[in-house]
Amino acid sequence: MINPELQQYVEREILPRYDHHDAAHRRDHVLTVIGQSLAIARQLRQQGVDIDEDMAYAIAAYHDTGLCEGRDHHHEVSARIIRQDMELRRWFSPEQIEVMAQAAHDHRASSGHAPRTLYGRIVAEADRVIVPETIVRRTIQYGLDHYPTLDREQHYERTVQHLREKYGEGGYLRLWFDDSPNAARLTRLRQLIASPAQLRPLFDRLFAELK
């Protein structure tokens, strides 16, 4: 069970920050990452791994707070926010806070190195919300927010390029747990990416809903 005071603080002071992010990284996203992080942490505890669920919860809650300063270095900013938030010292030791900051820094899928700690692997895995329709939707949302001058065909080309670079065979996304449900989901997503006959109608429907 998460510390009630920590949860109240996060819900009051941290989660509202996501309401100002782009549509692909708002409150629904962070709540999903929190839920998946806790599910992974609890599964590991059942396997006998020593995991602090409060740490896993807080890391997930803070992992994208750095988007307030843009996307390119948001993982670094998120780590800084954790280190500078004096309220976290009510619940965590300096050593725990440093582990949490490192985990937030390491969560980004496009980072060139593996997460340094188990907590980094947890939030990185939880951040891979591999539900094919959700992935395509979030990709379109990001494109509409950040490239508003593109027309429909250009958005489709950008979507396909991003999906291939991140999720395709040889893409930069990595999964950190062999028994992760994301493994089967990634296989289904790759099948979708490889099939324009399936991907294009899905794109057209979602684009019309979001435009």
List PLM regions with ranges.
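His-Asp-centered metal-binding catalytic motifs of divalent-metal-dependent phosphohydrolases/nucleases
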Residues: 51-70, 74, 78, 99-109
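Short amphipathic alpha-helical segments
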Residues: 8-12, 27-35, 54, 59
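Divalent metal-dependent phosphate-bond-processing catalytic cores, especially two-metal-ion Mg2+/Mn2+ enzymes
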Residues: 19-49, 62, 111-211
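An active-site-proximal "capping" alpha-helix that borders the catalytic cofactor pocket
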Residues: 33-38, 73-88
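Short alpha-helical hairpin
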Residues: 1-16
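Active-site metal-coordination segments of metallo-dependent hydrolases
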Residues: 21-32, 66-77, 94
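Hydrophobic, well-structured mid-protein blocks that either form specific transmembrane helices
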Residues: 79-116
